[in-house]
């Protein structure tokens, strides 16, 4: 059921070629003290200010962070997708008692987020290399927030 709902909203791919991750490039660029992540093309997926890695650079991440207005102190947050870990870093800093789980399908994205984007690594931040939709379909877990 969840897979069908997410598929309707996010054009979830069921074609096997969607999972041929070796063909999807993961690249990092830098310009004017901003480091950016590109997945599969030159579109900026995530950006980080090298002088202030916690600050949110892209408008869509700023809008997504507004969820804290409605749920200021979540205990458990699930992120479906890691990218450059912009939201993970922001929530990690401002939600000090929260535990986080991130589902990321592309192993190179995880590696790049840790190596180039200061992705937090400790007991509060779990990153699982898996298909987020399949994970949600197969696990009956509850979270205060699910962010994708």
List the predicted regions and their residue ranges.
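Rossmann-like AdoMet
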Residues: 1-74, 93
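The AdoMet/dcAdoMet-binding core of the Class I SAM-like
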Residues: 19, 54-148
């Amino acid at each position: 059921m969840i897979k069908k709902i997410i598929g309707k909203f996010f054009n979830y791919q069921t074609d096997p070629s969607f999972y041929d991750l070796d063909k999807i490039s993961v690249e990092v660029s830098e310009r004017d003290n901003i480091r950016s992540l590109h997945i599969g093309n030159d579109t900026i997926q995530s950006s980080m200010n090298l002088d202030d890695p916690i600050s949110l650079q892209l408008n869509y991440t700023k809008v997504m962070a507004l969820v804290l207005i409605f749920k200021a102190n979540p205990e458990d947050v699930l992120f479906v997708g890691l990218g450059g870990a912009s939201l993970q870093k922001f929530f990690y800093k401002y939600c000090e008692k929260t535990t986080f789980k991130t589902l990321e399908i592309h192993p190179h994205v995880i590696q790049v987020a840790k190596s180039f984007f200061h992705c937090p690594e400790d007991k509060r931040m779990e990153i699982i290399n898996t298909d987020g939709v399949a994970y949600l379909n197969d696990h009956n877990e509850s979270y205060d927030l699910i962010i994708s």
